[in-house]
Amino acid sequence: MSEEQRRAGLLLRTAAKTLDFILIAAVMEMVPRVGFYAGLAYLLLGDGFFDGRSLGKKLIKLKVVSANTYTPCTFRDSILRNSTFAAGYIFWLVPWIGWIVLFLVSVLEFTLVLGSKDGMRLGDEIAGTVVIETQ
């Protein structure tokens, strides 16, 4: 595996996803009526931008690629890999339950990353993607 194809660790992936959720929260607060839907769209499509990088991944220098070919993540792959977080995000509008569901989805996903020899979470398994570090 070349330097460019080094798998990203849990800490870097968590930092990138946290930055993405901060961006989503800012959009939700700034544009209340459509902010939720804009946030959902970004959550689902974000990894398809910038050659396989959401804004959070771009800042942390991570990239989502196909597990087999190492080609950048497509919008289709992004939707598939982030559908698990999107399912939790949809419950966000339900007081308390939304927070709990999103928290449980996040814990499940990050636990799977730790338990996977390839560092793949459920969303990665569904989409056939991995997250790598870049220069």
Language-model-detected regions and their locations in the chain:
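Membrane-interfacial and juxtamembrane segments of integral membrane proteins
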Residues: 1-135
